[in-house]
Amino acid sequence: MEPIYKKYSKSKFDENGRLIDFKIDCPENFNFGYDVVDAIASAEPDKKALIYLDENGYERTFTFKEISDLSSKTANFLTKQGIKKGDKVMLILKRNYEYWYTITALHKIGAVAVPATHLLKTEDIVYRVNCIDVKAVICTGEDRVSHCVYESKAKCENLQKLFCVRKDVDGFIRLDEAIKTESADFERVDTKIDEPFILYFTSGTTGYPKPVTHNHTYPLAHIITAAYWQNVKDGGLHLTVSDTGWGKASWGKIYGQWLCGTAVMVYDYERFNSDEILRVIRDYGVTTFCAPPTVYRFIVKNGFKAEDFKNVSYVTTAGESLNPSIIEQFENVTGLLIREGFGQTETTLLIGNLVGCDVKVGSIGKPSPLYNVKIVKDNGEECEPDETGEIVVITNGDRDDGICISRGDSGNDDSRVFIDNVYHTGDLAYADKDGYYWYVSRKDDVIKSSGYRIGPFEIENVLMKHESVQECAITGVPDEERGFVVKATIVLVSGYEGSEELKTELKEYVKTHTAPYKYPRIIEFVHELPKTISGKIRRAEIRGDVK
């Protein structure tokens, strides 16, 4: 059986094997649960879908047949519990394997899956549940998580059902036990591709997170993500480092990967440990790997060997720009070039260093052929080469495949991001003469100092080359004379002390590696940087814009 994604897409390539045109081609009733999971299970029941490993050494492999049966059992039970098409169901399942068959069950029912991270506190859950009228929550039975979920119920008028897995908890229905007596046959529910499928909350680098809803074409838009950016292969094993509550999980832990016929590697851990991640990659024969920039930084800074990636053929990253120095150090050891990509919770892969493309280190690549991506000025005119502007997507009136169908409370907060069918990302970049895109910053992260416009990433990139710097964030601080001055907030590598002498050394280091006006006049050493629940640096919090 050839990978099933070919049934639902049409691709065109140039003489170098580079994707130059891509179209989604699916019936109006396409449903990932039936038409991908069940279809593969029927054709190749023993095909591996998922390898699960926890930090205590417990291991379990799931075939597509097992995922198909478990999801149908779960769908039958949830239906009996009153969950129906269109209902919103929140999933707080960490990296537990129950996530994969449970979300597939929700897709079969036609319910709207709402993945959320286990790091949420009670007030975070209350806000999200009430914002979108969540009907049920399915969570891990872990004490802290289930306690927060239970506490939230009293403050959520429309929250009707609580389910948990792996542990009996008062006030919850034990889902993984309840489904054991259910039938593995589930009658197909009629769903349409333009109906709500999955809902994420934005990571909220500024202000409250906003709900973002995708329709049933969303998994198919991730074919490019998996096949032509991550370069996963039929029968391979892909590892994306992500909690299931983040949008990154949809990019790398289920949809595009299963459409391409590759199994996903799931390592379930409490605290990130780069040595353990490397062991999993090496010992389980991971063939393709994707991780946020922070993970690569820790891997490089903490040390690794070529042997750790002996079976890996392709590595990718997205989430925020990765410093070229890290890319170069990683390639020097492994021979693997980290390929960057760019997208948002509201989209799939918009821009990337796709298979067959030459890579310019530091560039996020070229636009995906699925989208009409441009860089524009504030007045909407397209920018010239090397001119910084905002990344936008020109959509059709019905929104393109993979672009969210609504953003904001009850779909009413689109006005700032969708203007005349143009989706505004809020991210700044420029394109060089060869069409490669170079990320600059979020629009509100640009520092205006003494008439200069300074992007934080270029300074962060310089600082990251210094041996003492583990992580850093550049922000602007108000200044009467200059408008703003540059501030560097730095996490030091273990063993370094945050002295005045080191501050002076770092300032001089920046001056000698970039234009002197960009150097940080203020340096603060901290133990950690404030981040969103998805791991992005909250520069707004460092600036003091958000309390």
Which residue ranges define each predicted feature?
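Conserved pre-ATP/AMP-binding loop-to-beta segment of ANL
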Residues: 45-48, 164-171, 180-201, 208, ...
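Conserved AMP-binding/adenylate-forming core of the ANL superfamily
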Residues: 46, 50-104, 121-126, 174-180, ...
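Conserved AMP-binding A3 loop
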Residues: 60-65, 197-221
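Structural core segment of the AMP-binding/adenylate-forming
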Residues: 80, 104, 108-177, 285, ...
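Conserved AMP-binding/adenylation subdomain of ANL enzymes
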Residues: 110, 220-240, 244-287, 302
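AMP-binding/adenylate-forming catalytic core of the ANL superfamily
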Residues: 120-121, 126-127, 137-142, 289, ...
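Gly/Ser/Thr-rich phosphate-binding loop
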Residues: 259, 286-291, 300-360, 372
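Conserved ATP/PPi-binding loop(s) of AMP-dependent carboxylate-activating enzymes
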Residues: 367-370, 381-416, 454
